[in-house]
């Protein structure tokens, strides 16, 4: 096939064997089911209540039995042929002779939920119906085993327990609708059980001797109601498992799959135990990241007294079998610490285990978390008695800390003198210090940098002892430029009114003169091609282009007279998102939090590859995923779309996803760069964060992905970072991303940002989506606020990215 043929508005050309489509194929759906099972986490299993014994009769309680949430809303939504809920999954197991299901109860929930759907409700945003005593008694007569399912939904553009701020911000539009609906359904906030859910749970606990709980959620929720409850024997964190999530859950409940997932977050006793909760809703216009680097387990394992506030630690997850492990060797050579760990299945069932390596740096002058994840490995399936040796590697320089105030060496990563402990285990709390210590004899600078994206108005930050230190204040002076436009008017022009009509493939083949394909074929260099383009040509490249085919998130490129294709973009993190009106059903993959909970880079890479095949088959070139922001707070409405509270786990998972995607010569777009940890007023909220926390927590996962997977594109975020829109932040986009990390790809804005287009271009943000503002760039050029060289540089990066596309 000729290069870019799919971008020239051609009919879909199937990628499968014998002319079959891979989009939504049985093979991809099977992979989605398998991935879902790999990431579900068994939190509790008293008296081996799970797996359910063959032939057991079960009663399925809670609307979540049929009201299955496959994933979150917004860019993470996917159009699918079907969604398998838990009732349907358990009925399949019944057909296989493994369980018997009390249908009358499930049908009661099904009838109620279908009525709520007909009235406009969406999965997860429904009311728990009252459980009639008569039906409860019938269920108890049928069986002594109950399965309760609790489900939750959240989405792009609104936060959980979204409250009107105290500084004048008024919720409107979708934010207002979703927050009002959430408040109506979840009177205690959706972190906790509703009154109706709690009443149902209490009834079931009293009536049934065997109670199992399934949590169909996208992120952190309250766990204290089942953590120490003797009446509840087992709890499965099933997450939002994609289109086959209900069947994947049934696979685990019935023992066809042995759970091997591990938590990618810390589950505290109460919402208020997370340091971010205190100020998450303090203002709609800023968030002070005063907890600094002490996010998630870094807080709970370090700050005095915080450890006792944890219900389930980071990295925790049970299995149906037992494992023993022992360190068989530890050494350092050429700046890399290597630890060999032998894992043995000592139980009676086949299963997998995850070995986690943490390091503990000396407190020194900077202060450090007690433990930091440094490496991890998952075993293959081990049969009873089988063993496997895992090799975990930790580069010494990975243990360095960033000194933003000059306590050791200003604006540098440093290894402070002292002993660096190594811990091995299966979660952060149980990880034990091994008989190996790495010693740094004197303070050592591993990388000298310069101050970038530092705060102006963050007044204080947390230290390792739980106290706070004052931070220096400074004033921001904006670079001279055009008077700013009304930010609420920005984004109104539509690409369909600005973009040029594209060129179809046959016309492209017949075109004469210089063609962009000459660059791809090696007949001329990209620089030679750039010399032919006028300034107007370059400016036209810097904005989004019209949709074609089944795409709905617009394109990039599109200079028909030069044969530059209009390459399409598409959401999103849970699968290829195509509008229902197009009639294309794709595969809905498990949510990102579940994928991170697999702790399996190879599996995530397979998911990325399969998803990219669907993107490519539908003539789309850039997949707007993965989303890699940190789980700073459980209240962020988009956490389901992100991987973890830990930047190393998020970075390794994201890098695996990018490798899988780009193996198909489809561009991944890693987002949202950076510190986009709140959805309320997301286009105008300022993340005030220290440079150290920014570099060690909120940028580190992006750095790992850039250096290990080389993504074609990065998407800058809506929010401001220390007073400057991320899309206009030159220190971030050029100084850190390109100059320090060596990123050579394309930077795109998120869709319809509040940033000024010409300022974004100057900062290193190459294209404004979904629409550009060429007149504004021309005005800035004429008045000397942007140069032709800056414009051409971004245009060149756009064309260079298109050259990478198949």
What are these regions (language model features)?
Residues 430-449:
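Short beta-strand elements
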Residues 1-430, 451-806:
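Glycoside hydrolase catalytic-domain context in secreted enzymes
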């Amino acid at each position: 096939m000729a290069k870019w043929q799919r971008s020239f508005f051609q009919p879909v050309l199937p990628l499968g064997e014998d002319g079959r489509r891979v989009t939504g194929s049985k093979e991809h759906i099977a992979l989605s089911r398998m991935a879902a099972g790999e990431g579900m986490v068994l939190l509790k299993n008293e008296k081996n209540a799970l797996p359910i014994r063959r032939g057991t009769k079960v009663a399925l309680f809670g609307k979540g039995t049929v009201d299955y949430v496959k994933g979150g809303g917004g860019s993470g939504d996917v159009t699918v042929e079907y969604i398998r809920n838990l009732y349907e999954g358990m009925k399949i197991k019944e057909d296989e002779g493994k369980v018997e299901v009390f249908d009358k109860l499930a049908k009661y929930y099904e009838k109620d939920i279908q009525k709520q759907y007909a009235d406009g409700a969406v999965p997860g945003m429904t009311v728990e119906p009252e459980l009639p005593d008569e039906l409860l008694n019938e269920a108890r007569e049928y069986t002594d085993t109950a399965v309760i399912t609790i489900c939750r939904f959240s989405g792009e553009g609104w936060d959980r327990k979204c409250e009107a701020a105290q500084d004048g911000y008024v919720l409107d539009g979708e934010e207002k609708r979703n927050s009002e609906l959430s408040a109506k359904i979840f009177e205690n906030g959706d972190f906790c059980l509703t009154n109706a859910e709690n009443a149902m749970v209490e009834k079931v606990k009293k009536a049934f001797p065997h109670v199992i709980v399934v949590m169909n959620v996208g992120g952190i929720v309250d766990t204290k109601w089942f953590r120490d409850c003797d009446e509840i024997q087992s709890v499965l964190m099933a997450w939002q498992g994609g289109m086959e999530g209900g069947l994947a859950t049934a696979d685990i409940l019935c023992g066809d799959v042995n759970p091997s997932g591990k938590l990618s977050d810390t589950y505290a006793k109460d919402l208020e135990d997370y340091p971010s909760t205190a100020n998450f809703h303090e203002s709609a216009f800023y968030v002070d990241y005063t907890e600094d680097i002490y996010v998630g387990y870094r807080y709970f394992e370090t700050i005095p007294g915080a450890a006792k506030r944890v219900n389930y630690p980071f990295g925790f997850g049970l299995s149906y079998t037992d494992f023993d492990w022992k360190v068989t060797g530890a050494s350092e050579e050429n700046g890399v610490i290597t630890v060999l760990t032998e894992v043995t299945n000592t139980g009676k069932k086949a299963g997998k285990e995850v070995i986690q390596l943490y390091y503990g740096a000396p407190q020194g002058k900077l202060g450090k978390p007690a433990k930091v994840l440094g490496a991890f490995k998952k075993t293959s399936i081990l049969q009873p008695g089988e063993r496997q040796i895992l090799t975990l590697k930790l580069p010494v320089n990975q243990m360095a800390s960033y000194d933003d105030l000059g306590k050791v060496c200003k604006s540098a990563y440093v290894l402070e003198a002292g002993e660096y402990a190594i811990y091995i285990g299966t979660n952060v709390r149980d990880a034990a210090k091994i008989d190996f210590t790495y010693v740094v004899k004197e303070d050592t600078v591993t990388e000298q940098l310069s101050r970038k994206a530092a705060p102006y108005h963050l007044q204080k930050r947390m230290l390792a002892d739980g106290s706070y230190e004052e931070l220096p204040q400074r004033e921001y002076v904006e670079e001279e430029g055009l008077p700013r436009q009304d930010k609420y008017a920005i984004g109104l022009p539509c690409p369909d009114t600005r973009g040029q009509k594209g060129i179809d493939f046959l016309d492209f083949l017949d075109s004469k003169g210089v063609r962009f394909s000459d660059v791809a074929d090696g007949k001329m260099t990209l620089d030679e091609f750039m010399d032919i383009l006028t300034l107007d040509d370059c400016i036209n490249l810097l904005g989004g282009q019209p949709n074609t085919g089944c795409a709905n998130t617009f394109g990039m490129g599109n200079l028909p007279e030069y044969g530059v294709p209009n390459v399409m973009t598409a959401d999103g993190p849970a699968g290829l998102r195509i509008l229902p009106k197009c009639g294309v059903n794709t595969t809905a993959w498990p949510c990102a939090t579940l994928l991170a909970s697999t702790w399996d880079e190879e599996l995530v890479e397979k998911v990325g590859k399969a998803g990219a095949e669907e993107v490519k088959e539908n003539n789309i070139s850039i997949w707007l995923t993965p989303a890699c922001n940190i789980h700073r707070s459980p209240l962020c409405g988009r956490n389901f779309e992100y991987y973890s509270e830990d930047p190393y786990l998020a970075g390794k998972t994201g890098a695996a996803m990018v490798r899988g995607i780009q193996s198909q010569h489809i561009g991944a777009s890693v987002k949202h760069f950076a510190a986009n940890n709140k959805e309320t007023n997301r286009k105008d909220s300022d993340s005030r964060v220290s440079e150290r926390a920014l570099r060690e927590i909120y940028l580190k996962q992006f750095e790992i992905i850039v250096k290990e997977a080389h993504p074609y594109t990065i998407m800058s975020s809506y929010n401001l970072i220390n007073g400057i829109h991320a899309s206009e932040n030159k220190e971030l986009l050029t100084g850190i991303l390109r100059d320090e990390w060596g990123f050579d790809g394309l930077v795109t804005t998120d869709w319809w940002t509040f940033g000024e287009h010409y300022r974004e271009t100057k900062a290193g943000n190459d294209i404004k989506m979904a629409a550009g503002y060429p007149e504004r760039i021309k005005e800035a050029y004429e008045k000397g606020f942007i140069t032709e060289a800056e414009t051409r540089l971004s245009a060149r990066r756009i064309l260079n990215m298109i050259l990478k596309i198949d």
